[in-house]
């Protein structure tokens, strides 16, 4: 089985400019690169600082301002999934930007329930709010989701994700800004869960299965 190392970025919501948010993302990218990660997932609306206080989301950012993340994905041979507003059905909703080594511009998707991808596949499958296993690309082996939840919503979400991983036999990586980011394997077993604070939750897949680690960032 091929080696695969993935990570979830976790940090408290922060209100700064888009330029500063991108710079903050790059700090996590460099930390993930030092761990030789091939995938890095950020929390929901990470490019807005994971800020849910606004009643209505702003328009999507100018994609040229995200060029540093495109360059980082190419430089470090890493797929990066960040959260941002997207236009969908004539309104602005939560979405994701996927920066990949093989892309010159980010792929933009509505976030919905999350996204599935595989170790060697270049396909990103966005999963609907009520996911069905048959809708997933068979090459997908990891489901990723970015969130910004506190209790009690976080506990309910974690239970759903654990059930999802077991039901559809797929590993699940959750990046949650407010703590308790986690990784479950394809059997629904919890591999690693973070506490609170600024950190990388790292998962490694090998012939022995999934293993996890927590890397604090200061």
UniProtKB/Swiss-Prot annotation:
Domain of life: Bacteria
PROSITE patterns: CN_HYDROLASE
Record organism: Escherichia coli (strain K12)
Listed name of the protein: Uncharacterized protein YobB
Residue stretches making up the CN hydrolase domain: 4-207
InterPro entries (UniProt xref): C-N_Hydrolase, C-N_Hydrolase_sf
Name of encoding gene: yobB
